[in-house]
Each structure stands twice: as C-alpha cells, then as structure tokens.
C-alpha cells in the first residue's frame, strides 16, 4: 500500500554520498535483525542502528576517501540529525543499486529521508520515505 503525500520543498541539513553497494549490503544485513532502522548523522559520521529483544547492532561509517562516504553538505556539523525508518522499504529501494556506483542520502530531522540514484545520461531516481512514528 502506497500513500501519495505532498512533500514541501526543504533545505536539508545533511547530504552525503555513499557507495550504493555498501548501502544495499548494510540494509540487507540489518533487515535480518529488525523491522526498523535508526539513521543518525552527527559530526563527520553516519550511524545505522537496529535493535530487538536479543541484539543491538550499530554500524558507524566515518567520512573518508578510502570508504567512499563523503558529506556533500553538512550545514550544522554539531547538530544530530536522525530518524527511524522501515528497513523493509529501504531494502526495496536498494534494488536500484546496479543503476549507479554512489547514492546520495538527504537527511533532516522530522522529515522524510530521500535516497537519490543518478542514472548515467538518463537522469535520476529519488525515493522518499517518511520516518516511522513512535505512537
């Protein structure tokens, strides 16, 4: 079931580039542990956290030339930007991995996450996923 929601224009606090294969592997691996993933950007690092009754797992990716993760925009490096999202939906989005080498992740507090795949000369594919409510 898909809801059509109007998303107002916004300036994102954090925009980063990450290898698409790393994002796909991370989402697939963590989807075995939980239905929800917390994504947090703080300083020069990105954290992916899942938890359930038996296990907590956090994967931290620091900005580095070697691992391919880089901030394109980081308006407030001291601000913590985070949200909880459906990992099942992120795994579905990651099926576009073969379209490009790197993805862009747009993050802002209390706002949907946007994942952008640039497809060579054809354009781009953007996926938007609203944060999960804790209600």
How should these model regions be labeled?
Residues 1, 63-70:
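Short acidic, glycine/tyrosine-flanked loop/strand segments centered on an H-E-D-like triad
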């Amino acid at each position: 079931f898909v809801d059509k929601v109007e998303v107002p224009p916004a300036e994102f606090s954090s925009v980063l580039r990450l290898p698409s294969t790393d994002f796909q592997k991370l989402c697939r691996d963590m989807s075995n542990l939980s239905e929800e993933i917390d994504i947090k950007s703080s300083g020069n690092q990105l954290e992916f956290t899942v938890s359930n009754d038996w296990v907590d797992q956090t994967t931290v990716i620091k900005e580095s030339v070697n691992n391919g993760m880089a901030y394109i925009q980081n308006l407030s490096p001291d601000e913590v930007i985070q949200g909880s999202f459906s990992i099942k939906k992120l795994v579905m989005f990651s099926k576009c991995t073969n379209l490009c080498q790197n993805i862009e992740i747009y993050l802002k507090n209390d706002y949907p996450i946007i994942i952008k795949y640039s497809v060579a000369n054809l354009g781009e594919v953007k996926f938007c996923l609203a944060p999960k409510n804790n209600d």
